[in-house]
């Protein structure tokens, strides 16, 4: 009978296994609560834990119990009103018996919700479940630091932990056979002659002495020698890595009011958390633009108050310049995400179309554009519609009207593709 011992380290919480089973069972309720939390949270509080409320009726278990009809003989404790043989009127259907609830209600019934807390780790797991960067491919990089060990046969040297017992014993057995073969053949001849001769004869005594000497020589051969030890050989092979770079392009022009900028920042913060959590080797390039574009760090990207006019092509040109100098397409998976309110200088939308179709999209794996506006779509949106028709597999565009649209649109843009 086989026994499997799970030696994986568990957390300090003794009920972790039951908790994980509970989270899997009610993941639909939790996913909805996580989605609602993203809509109402501030930018700085988007990655903390969350209190999840599940209606009691959804976690109730089916049970067997007596129905309200039929005739039953029961012993009721605490009876001070009836004697044996008294007839008790049957209550009407639906009456009698107290219920549980959360206070007064005009509906006549109610139950408290079951509320529990999920950690930051669990919150982010549900937040980014089934999401992935589209079209991510393996690329062999110069100076690659990732390796894996592969079997490469047998070696005569190695660490004790890699010793190959079967090969070592086989080698020892072969050595003993090779070194004692001549002696064993002579020993067989001597034993055959001894069976013919008289035991007391002088010739037999000489053969016995020779046989004893042969046995002693055979025993002197070591059973296992250092030369017999064989080790499993493992060699390092470089691995192709999925290094990726994400360009975040945000419009901070004067037409973007504070509410629109907050929606854009929340979208990019969600994207940034997703990349940092799921892809360790992903670099992020932040570009803010109005009439001119500027590469900034994370702090300035999310919290700078600089503003101005609107020339979207300045950000696309800067992205192309950075690609040429730092991120060659042959070695990097390149992604782009752009957020704007759609307002642009009149003739600049045509320039944006040319930059995307001629320079950027042939190099990138995926490029997404979100337009944050409740107004009618303008020239930039229509120009990007032409881009979408030319590159349907690597370009995507969505419209956001409020903060409630951020998470659903984010999941649409980065939904894991099934092949």
Swiss-Prot record:
Instruction: Give the region (Disordered) as residue ranges.
Output: 63-111
- Residues in a coiled coil are none
Compositionally biased intervals (Basic and acidic residues): 83-92
The similarity annotation says:
Belongs to the UPF0229 family.
Matching NCBIfam families: PRK05325.1-2, PRK05325.1-3
Q: What is this protein called?
A: UPF0229 protein TERTU_3150
Task: State the species of origin.
Answer: Teredinibacter turnerae (strain ATCC 39867 / T7901)
């Amino acid at each position: 009978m086989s026994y499997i011992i799970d030696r994986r380290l568990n957390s300090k919480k003794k009920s972790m296994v039951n908790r994980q089973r509970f989270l899997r069972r009610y993941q639909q309720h939790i996913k909805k609560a996580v989605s609602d939390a993203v809509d109402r949270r501030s930018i700085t509080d988007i990655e903390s834990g969350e209190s999840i409320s599940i209606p009691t009726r959804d976690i109730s278990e089916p049970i067997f119990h007596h129905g309200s009809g039929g005739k039953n003989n029961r012993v009721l404790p605490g009876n001070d009103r009836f004697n044996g043989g008294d007839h008790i009127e049957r209550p009407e259907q639906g009456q009698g018996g107290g219920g549980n609830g959360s206070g007064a209600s005009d509906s006549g019934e109610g139950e408290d919700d079951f509320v529990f807390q999920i950690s930051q780790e669990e919150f982010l797991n549900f937040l980014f479940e089934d999401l992935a960067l589209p079209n991510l491919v393996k690329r062999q990089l110069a100076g690659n630091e990732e390796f894996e060990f592969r079997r490469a046969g047998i070696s005569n040297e190695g660490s004790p932990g890699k010793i190959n017992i079967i090969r070592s014993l086989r080698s020892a057995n072969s050595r003993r056979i090779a070194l004692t073969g001549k002696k064993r053949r002579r020993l067989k001849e001597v034993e055959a002659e001894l069976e013919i001769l008289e035991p007391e004869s002088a010739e037999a005594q000489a053969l016995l002495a020779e046989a004893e000497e042969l046995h002693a020589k055979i025993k002197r051969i070591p059973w296992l020698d250092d030369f017999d030890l064989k080790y499993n050989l493992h060699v390092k092979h470089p691995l192709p890595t999925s290094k990726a770079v994400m360009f975040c392009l945000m419009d901070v022009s004067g037409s973007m009011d504070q509410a629109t900028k907050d929606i854009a920042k929340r979208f990019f913060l969600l994207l940034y958390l997703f990349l940092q959590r799921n892809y360790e080797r992903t670099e992020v390039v932040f570009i803010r633009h109005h009439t001119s574009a500027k590469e900034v760090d994370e702090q300035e990207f999310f919290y700078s108050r600089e503003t101005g006019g609107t020339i979207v092509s300045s950000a696309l040109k800067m992205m192309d310049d950075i690609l040429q100098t730092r991120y060659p397409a042959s070695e990097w998976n390149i992604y782009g995400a752009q957020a704007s309110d759609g307002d642009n200088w009149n003739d600049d939308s045509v320039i944006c179309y040319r930059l995307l179709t001629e320079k950027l999209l042939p190099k990138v794996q995926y490029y997404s554009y979100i337009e944050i506006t409740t107004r009618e779509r303008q020239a930039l949106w229509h120009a990007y519609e032409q881009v979408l028709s030319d590159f349907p597999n690597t370009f995507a565009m969505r419209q956001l009207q409020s903060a409630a649209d951020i998470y659903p649109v984010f999941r649409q843009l980065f939904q894991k593709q099934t092949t």
